[in-house]
Amino acid sequence: MELNKTVSNPMLVGVMQLIKADGKTPDPKHQEMFMEELDKAEFLAPAEIKAEVGPDGEKLVNGKAQFRFPILTGADGRRFFVVFTDNATVEKAQAMEGASALPEEFVKETVTVKFSDLARFILTPNPDGSENTTYGIVINPFMENIVIPKNLVAAVTMRKQKEAKEKLEKVASVLAKSADPKVIPFPGNKDEGQD
């Protein structure tokens, strides 16, 4: 995770716009494109960061940094992990006022996260062992406002794990075939009946 990094996801933003334009029944091709881009993307997640400060006044995000990610609670009580697609969207969020304004902790500092980080954050039980009640992820809240429920995060994660397992099995199969234990004959090899 990097602190206050410049991030841009033009393909993901484009696919999000396609899905929004699709309305209530998104095109399956757009959904598949969204899942692919989601997996490739780096996001900016609001965070309260406790870290040592370097000589230049910047926080040092090394192994000793602690992050607290604020959770956005909707009017219906559902809790969301918030991420932004790019720095321009964070700046828009910082400039918002009124009912759509995010609390200050959502727009102060950001760290980069990948989808796999987000999945771990919302699918892992709380430190005390209780169920994590986060409903899902919201991308660009009060703007594009794309919601990815926890069950979809779990499905995408399981799909990625299945694909990785299939790739490993394919590689293992190729290696098993190429590691034929029979001896390759060459002059002077006594195992092949040559003297």
For each feature predicted by the language model, list its residue ranges.
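An interfacial alpha-helical scaffold signature
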Residues: M1-D195
